């Protein structure tokens, strides 16, 4: 039973944290609340420190393409089976404590009602509120383990949420490919365009420049907490500029509306807090939304 519900591994607790005055926080409930408050405020706090830009992001948005994605096509029974069986069983359960392995084993029994719910969601532009709850697990990175900033949040989403997201991902991604919207030199989070491909392309350009006895100059930027600071309103504007409109755009808008998250440490849960910006690390749609969000960066930098 433990293997089936993903609870066969020994839980490892984070180190005791320290508060603002340097005193240790040992209560798992207080540690969970400390983490949740920190993770929830990362994006808004960083966004408040960003200096106003001299130009609006709208100045760099390309004209709306002639083709548009105004609605999502329905998911078929075959597609649902392919999507669901494609998930790995090792995925930890989300807030509903239902691991994907259970969904896969019972898919033949729940396929019809699940298919109806997914297609109703896609056609109405509404994402179920029960699937907007994220369970956050703090993962230690490095340095001082008693400081919350040295942990990164991993979002454990409901298994059904991931199925919804995978259906929407495939439709948005195919539309972007068909309309050739994505910048061709964009690497990361794309099939056939990994960071390894970026290194190969970069080394090739450097080698060619050296062979031609040209001077080389490079600018490398680190986008601090990039996923956490993503502005939902800006993303939605860029999605519309890409041609994603109608109920498809409504669905994405509702996907971000009233999302909440909590941190769990052992059996202790923090208070649930609302997520007001950013995309979830651990979600399927998050990386794709981030790609669209920074799509016009080359146009901005070239000017």
Task: Write out the residue ranges for each language-model feature.
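Active-site-proximal segment of RNA-dependent polymerases
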Residues: 50-80, 126, 131, 135, ...
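Conserved catalytic palm subdomain of right-hand nucleotidyl-transferase polymerases, strongest
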Residues: 90-98, 147-156, 197-237
